[in-house]
Design a protein with these regions (language model features):
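Extracellular/periplasmic carbohydrate-active domains that bind, remodel
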Residues: 1-150
């Protein structure tokens, strides 16, 4: 799947949400969601869920929730399918406002593995990188690498 050089404004919910995909590239994408009120609920930017071999590069994301969220299923369903989100590269991105720049979870019952975040700028987010889960959710996070972030 290739999503490249598009601008998305005011998506009503999670903006780009590939699920159970292999070989996903999101490049040169601009997301303003919402464009005027940076506090809109559930206005995530890019949310790969149970995907493998994902590259997110050279994106500009300004949202009211999380800019990029890595997911892999929720509770019993996530454990039942057991498909991790893995081999994720996030590089050369600018993330503004929102709760988190890059967030792992909270829907991560299938696990998250081999994530690299590099050369990214977080400006005005509540947190740059955030790991979150809920009681009883389960799932592992393995091999998280972070390099040259501001």
């Amino acid at each position: 799947m290739l999503i490249e050089n598009v601008k998305i404004v005011n998506s009503p919910f999670w903006t780009i949400n590939p699920a159970f995909c292999d070989n996903v590239t999101v490049h040169g994408v601009t997301i303003y969601n919402p464009s005027k009120d940076p506090k809109g609920p559930n206005t995530d930017g890019i949310n790969p869920s149970s995907c493998r071999n994902v590259r997110i590069s050279d994106c500009f994301i300004s949202v009211g929730d999380d800019c990029i969220t890595i997911k892999s299923g929720r509770d019993a369903d996530g454990r039942k399918y057991g498909k991790a989100c893995e081999n994720i590269t996030i590089t050369n991105c600018v993330m503004l406002s929102g709760h988190g720049g890059v967030v792992i979870g909270s829907e991560m019952s299938g696990g998250v593995r081999r994530v690299t975040i590099s050369n990214c700028v977080f400006d005005g987010t509540d947190s740059g990188i955030r790991l979150k889960s809920s009681r009883g959710r389960g799932g592992v996070v393995e091999e998280l690498r972070v390099d040259n972030i501001v």
